[in-house]
């Protein structure tokens, strides 16, 4: 429930700030369920959590509430976020006349997910802003983590996202280059071959003590290095000489090459000596002329490690910009978990709606422009940021709403038979603001599907039609009697308005939600005109993308409310 609690906390704080410290539970409840229809089935829990949070914050000063909301969801502090002037993103130390060169450097272990999108988008944004160059560098020097299909999948994902790549570099094609610079480091006395057991070296490093290998001469190290390259020795690594008493033990003589006997998907068994990230990244960032590098603040230690290599070669370092962690709640992002689940048939593929892959978001109906904008809005702040699905959905809605026809959809349908009502044909607008979309026709004959639970002896209003009174309920069939047409009567009786589908000509429809669940139901007859990849809005349900049209069923993916 922690994710639900975070969602509720945002709206309680927003409401409390709006009403000067006097939050309205009913208004908060309506807002939450309206924005998050999946929570309707947990309305009781939601109500309880709202009450708990209101009690928790009742003595919190408004300025503290505002600070809390600013950290959780800054977009909720202003009811008109579009009117807030955003600071334009800029790069530091852009040299006049020198082209900006940047890189996006994923590991090809699977397709891209939402976490990758931040780096991809921001690098693309700056490369375009400064008329620079963006290199896609596929860092595949760990054969165990490479998925062969990912090389092309990543390119496809970037193209869909609107990221323009100027050049593609594959690190496994560059192993001889890394060997050349490994040789130079050994020749300069800055690196050595180490055959210590891992546990032995770990203990020495923890105590700031060098291992015996560190004092081997250059000639001996070159001999051992050549044996590594010629497959004549095993169980060794090449380490970079740093400060053996450095305050951070991980920086003390860290490894830059290791032996890996796993065949590589691209090169097979041709190579078995592979550079570690800090060596290959340093060499590539220099040789490829990187001017600016964007990466997470979890790489700050790696930047310090790489500085040793740049300094040993006398190279100028790029401008490194470290941004905070992007916390993404909800979908599965672990590539290993996704891959394993696909193999075990737990998931349907890399576009399973439970995933946070770009392919999954595309299948749900999230537009690339919406993702791009959300990442630019987040920017390169050093503070950790929680990803706002509300913002993404709001931007996406702005994009798809104008083309989304409206239809009724009845989930988990129940049959409602109404006595005493005339056969009536009604025509509803296919879109509230697009007259050219025309109308859709519903023919009421007293036999309809609904999804609501109704009560005996209670009045209800069929949307755009009649008032009825329920007489009895037998099994899954509800029997009611026509009462009147006047909407005022429904209002006076506080009649709930329910949407409906004529049983005759109803279109069997399945909506697959973000949990991968199949919601079965019926849509109105005119729904049959839709095409694959169309967006529609099921009234009082949400936006969906049309995924498949069969002879006996239309399958949709739930996009958002």
From Swiss-Prot:
One CC-aspect GO term: protein-containing complex
Enzyme Commission numbers on file: 6.1.1.17
InterPro entries referenced in this protein's UniProt entry, alphabetically: aa-tRNA-synth_I_CS (IPR001412), Gln/Glu-tRNA_Ligase (IPR050132), Glu-tRNA-synth_arc/euk (IPR004526), Glu/Gln-tRNA-synth (IPR000924), Glu/Gln-tRNA-synth_Ib_cat-dom (IPR020058), Glu/Gln-tRNA-synth_Ib_codon-bd (IPR020059), Rbsml_bL25/Gln-tRNA_synth_N (IPR020056), Ribosomal_bL25/Gln-tRNA_synth (IPR011035)
Catalytic activity, reaction form: tRNA(Glu) + L-glutamate + ATP = L-glutamyl-tRNA(Glu) + AMP + diphosphate
GO biological process: amide biosynthetic process; glutamyl-tRNA aminoacylation
Record keyword Phosphoprotein present: no
Top EC class, one word: ligase
Subcellular location: Cytoplasm
Predominant location category: cytoplasm
Keywords: Aminoacyl-tRNA synthetase, ATP-binding, Cytoplasm, Ligase, Nucleotide-binding, Protein biosynthesis
Keyword GTP-binding: no
GO molecular function, one term: ATP binding
Motif 'HIGH' region: where in chain: 106-116
Similarity comment: Belongs to the class-I aminoacyl-tRNA synthetase family. Glutamate--tRNA ligase type 2 subfamily.
Stated role: Catalyzes the attachment of glutamate to tRNA(Glu) in a two-step reaction: glutamate is first activated by ATP to form Glu-AMP and then transferred to the acceptor end of tRNA(Glu).
Protein's recorded name: Glutamate--tRNA ligase
Organism name: Methanococcus aeolicus (strain ATCC BAA-1280 / DSM 17508 / OCM 812 / Nankai-3)
Lineage: Archaea, Methanobacteriati, Methanobacteriota, Methanomada group, Methanococci
């Amino acid at each position: 429930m922690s994710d639900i609690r975070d969602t509720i906390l945002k709206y309680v704080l927003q409401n409390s700030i709006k009403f000067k410290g006097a939050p309205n539970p009913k208004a908060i409840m309506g807002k939450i369920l309206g924005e998050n229809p999946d929570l309707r089935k947990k309305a009781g829990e939601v109500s309880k959590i709202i009450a708990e949070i209101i009690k928790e914050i009742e003595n919190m000063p408004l300025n503290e509430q505002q600070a809390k909301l600013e950290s959780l969801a800054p977009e909720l502090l202003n009811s008109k976020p579009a009117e807030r002037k955003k600071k334009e993103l800029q790069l530091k130390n852009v040299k006049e006349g020198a082209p900006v060169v940047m890189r996006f450097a994923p590991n090809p272990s699977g397709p891209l997910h939402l976490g990758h999108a931040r780096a991809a988008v921001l690098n693309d944004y700056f490369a375009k802003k400064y008329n620079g160059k963006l290199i896609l560098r596929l860092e595949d020097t760990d054969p165990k983590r490479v998925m062969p299909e990912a090389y092309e999948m990543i390119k496809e994902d970037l193209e869909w996202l609107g990221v323009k790549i100027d050049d593609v570099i594959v690190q496994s094609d560059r192993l001889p280059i890394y060997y050349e610079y490994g040789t130079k480091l050994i020749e300069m006395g800055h690196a050595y071959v180490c055959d210590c057991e891992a546990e032995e070296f770990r203990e020495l490093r923890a105590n700031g003590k060098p291992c015996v290998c560190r004092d081997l001469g250059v000639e001996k190290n070159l001999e051992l290095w050549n044996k590594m390259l010629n497959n004549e020795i095993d169980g060794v690594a090449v380490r970079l000489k740093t400060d053996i008493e450095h305050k951070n033990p991980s920086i003390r003589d860290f490894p830059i090459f290791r032996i890996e006997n796993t065949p590589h998907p691209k090169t097979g068994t041709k190579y078995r000596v592979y550079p570690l990230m800090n060596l290959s990244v340093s060499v590539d960032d220099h040789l490829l002329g990187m001017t600016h590098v964007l990466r997470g603040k979890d790489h700050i230690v790696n930047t310090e490690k790489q500085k040793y290599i740049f300094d040993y070669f006398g190279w100028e370092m790029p401008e490194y910009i470290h941004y905070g962690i992007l916390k993404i709640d909800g979908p599965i992002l672990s590539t290993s978990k996704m891959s394993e689940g696909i193999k075990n048939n737990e998931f349907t593929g890399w576009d399973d709606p439970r995933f946070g892959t770009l392919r999954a978001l595309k299948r749900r109906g999230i537009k690339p422009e919406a993702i791009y904008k959300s990442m630019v809005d987040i920017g390169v702040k050093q503070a950790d940021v929680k990803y706002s699905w509300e913002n993404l959905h709001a931007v996406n809605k702005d994009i798809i709403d104008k083309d989304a026809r409206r239809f009724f959809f009845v989930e988990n349908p129940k049959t409602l038979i109404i006595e005493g009502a005339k056969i009536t044909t009604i025509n509803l607008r296919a879109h509230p603001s697009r007259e050219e979309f025309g109308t859709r026709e519903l023919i009421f004959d007293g036999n309809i599907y609904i999804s609501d639970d109704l009560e005996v002896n209670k009045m209800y209003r069929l949307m755009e039609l009649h008032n009825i009174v329920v007489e009895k309920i037998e099994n899954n069939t509800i029997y009611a009697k026509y009462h009147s047409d006047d909407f005022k009567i429904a209002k006076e009786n506080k009649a709930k308005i329910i949407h409906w589908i004529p049983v005759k000509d109803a279109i069997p429809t399945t909506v697959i939600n973000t949990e991968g669940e199949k919601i079965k139901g019926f849509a109105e007859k005119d729904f049959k005109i839709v095409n694959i990849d169309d967006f529609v809005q099921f009234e009082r349900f949400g936006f969906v993308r049309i995924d498949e049209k069969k002879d006996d069923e239309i399958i949709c993916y739930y996009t958002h409310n």
